[in-house]
Amino acid sequence: MAEPRQEFDVMEDHAGTYGLGDRKDQGGYTMLQDQEGDTDAGLKESPLQTPAEDGSEEPGSETSDAKSTPTAEDVTAPLVDEGAPXKQAAAQPHTEIPEGTTAEEAGIGDTPSLEDEAAGHVTQEPESGKVVREGFLGEPGPRSXSHQLASGMPGAPLLPEGPREATRQPSGTGPEDTEGGRHAPELLKHQLLGDLHQEGPPLKRAGGKERPGIKEEVDEDRDVDESSPQDSPPSKVSPAHDGRPPQTAAREATSIPGFPAEGAIPLPVDFLSKVSTEIPASEPDGPSAGRAEGQDAPPEFTFHVEITPNVQKEQAHSEEHLGRAAFPGAPGEGPEAQGPSLGEDTKEADLPEPSEKQPAAAPRGKPISRVPQLKARMVSKSKDGTGSDDKKAKTSTRSSAKTLKNRPCLSPKHPTPGSSDPLIQPSSPAVCPEPPSSPKYVSSVTXRTGSSGAKEMKLKGADGKTKIATPRGAAPPGQKGQANATRIPAKTPPAPKTPPSSVTKQVQRRPPPAGPKSERGEPPKSGDRSGYSSPGSPGTPGSRSRTPSLPTPPTREPKKVAVVRTPPKSPSSAKSRLQTAPVPMPDLKNVKSKIGSTENLKHQPGGGKVQIINKKLDLSNVQSKCGSKDNIKHVPGGGSVQIVYKPVDLSKVTSKCGSLGNIHHKPGGGQVEVKSEKLDFKDRVQSKIGSLDNITHVPGGGNKKIETHKLTFRENAKAKTDHGAEIVYKSPVVSGDTSPRHLSNVSSTGSIDMVDSPQLATLADEVSASLAKQGL
């Protein structure tokens, strides 16, 4: 499932809106949602990962409002039942959730019904498409380029960005094929889009809102998309293959009145720009990941639906998604996406506290952009306005957070210290060196870390929410972010135990040992869960505050602090943790362990130095029992063994009973004479009751005697009617009596009878005799 999450960037306008599902899971569907959390507009299916169906990740389709090349998913998206989030969830891997799936469909938030969306979108299509384009254009990197091309080059054929398209494209398909694909025979369309149609039509049925024509349109668009070269960079993506604006193509492809611009929701341009910084990073990764995935397997399409649920829900989702994103992302793909995103995020943030804005880059294995950004938690990497406000509010926290963030790199566990470190994921400790640009991963990491992780996530949620809210919601999210930030400082106060400067120092120290520390950090995470939280991670209240649920962190923080105090048993891990967290290590000397476990604190498993001394036994003075001493020098296994063969001389042997004659007998051969004597039992044996005749009987054959008994009923038969004629019957069996047998001519009354009429009898005899002579 190395589906690039990066390609799936959830464009969340608002801290309140939050993308559901890992971007990775959600395929290339970037859900651009308004602050209102309108899933219809918000769900911008970025055809980036429509590739699952198209076989290509089409940033271009995403560019074209994710519509320029309506994928089967786009077409089917409207069809997806809004009330079947579970369906979509199941479909996400293969039944790619149509890009048009609403948040409700995705199973999150209240999304206008497909019909409502259709009504709204029909009117909004042009505008929303434009806005979306602007948003995408605002996005730096392939997306912005693709959007620009989409909006700017309506005539240009859509070039599928993802290798998936290429994989699905018939060989030889290229930009030329793109147009050819439009006009390509329905066979090609059906072949390429067969998968999409199969999935799409059922979805359409579910939606029931798509017109039958949608399939064909989608097929055409898809064929074009698929035919378009995979490798074409997202920037190449042009609006519709037909040269229509991406929105138009999208509409036609979708053919869904409700989803003309399924993802098209007018998003604040600044938000798009903010997201764009995030997206470019994710996008670079997206195409590569998309290609790999496209070739390997259709990406799972997860829809990031920005919802405006209460922050806690977002936090819970974000934790889950972050957990998924953190570990699910292939380390290779994730890092690539994160690298760019981190760079961009850093640029955008350019805030003194890169740790907050750029939590240690989540290990590349964890795509940042792909993880749905929680409204509260994910600060769009472009932290305009609110980002700075959050920073101000968090300055105190930031120092600790920075240290914490840096710690997460060192030890994935430590991401808890930095609320913005969500990117740091225990799954890839070595990758930690890049601070994750988005707090998403931190949240995922914190979620994994258990209670301490949750607390951290809460803090992250506060920080991330403020940060993310700023990019998404523009100024208002920023304010929310500030409020969150203010909250976070209160939560983070426990972190202040380590001065900000010390925290930053710790952060600096940790980054180099990121690999080992992360490894160590991961065990601490388990420790945190167990209550041990590594000193570093508990020490930083920021991690606690990360958890979106702000109210809980304060209560949890003290626990974490206590946990942090427990130093790790391994000195190296303890050192790294101490560096990361200025919190003094608890004195183990004063601690009484259960069952004297402290005694073994320094125990080094694997055995100490064991000396095996081989002492030779002096057997010279030993007295053996029963004279066994003679064999004391016996070497088992036989030394030189001599087998003496003495031929036996039988010449002088006398045999018993004259058996000597057979002494030279060679068994198994010689001349064998078999004499067979036939015994004639007839001569010697007297049979019982004359059975001797059958003594030579050969069963199943031989001479058989067939005895035939003549049935004389005909001869005795009398005619019912007196016809006065004599019936002569010649028996088929040849007997000594060749004369034909006379069947008496009997009248029913018996008036004519051989006995009664001797004349007739004589006549019959004469006739029969004459006939017999003639051979009749």
Curated annotation (Swiss-Prot):
N6-acetyllysine sites (modified residues): K480, K560, K594, K616, K625, K633, K646, K652, K656, K666, K678, K682, K704, K720
Changes after translation: Polyubiquitinated. Requires functional TRAF6 and may provoke SQSTM1-dependent degradation by the proteasome. Phosphorylation at various serine and threonine residues in S-P or T-P motifs by proline-directed protein kinases (PDPK1, CDK1, CDK5, GSK3, MAPK) (a few sites per protein in interphase, more in mitosis), and at serine residues in K-X-G-S motifs by MAP/microtubule affinity-regulating kinase (MARK1, MARK2, MARK3 or MARK4), causing detachment from microtubules, and their disassembly. Phosphorylation at Ser-597 by BRSK1 and BRSK2 in neurons affects ability to bind microtubules and plays a role in neuron polarization. Phosphorylated by PHK.
Main localization of the protein described in the UniProt heading: cytoplasm
Modified residue annotations for Phosphothreonine: T69, T71, T111, T470, T486, T492, T498, T540, T547, T552, T566, T738, T762
Record field: compositional bias (Polar residues): 61-71, 736-751
Residue list for modification N-acetylalanine: A2
Subunit structure: Interacts with MARK1, MARK2, MARK3 and MARK4. Interacts with SQSTM1 when polyubiquitinated. Interacts with PSMC2 through SQSTM1. Interacts with FKBP4. Binds to CSNK1D. Interacts with SGK1. Interacts with EPM2A; the interaction dephosphorylates MAPT at Ser-396. Interacts with PIN1. Interacts with LRRK2. Interacts with LRP1, leading to endocytosis; this interaction is reduced in the presence of LRPAP1/RAP.
Protein name: Microtubule-associated protein tau
Originating species: Hylobates lar
Biological classification of the source: Eukaryota, Metazoa, Chordata, Craniata, Vertebrata
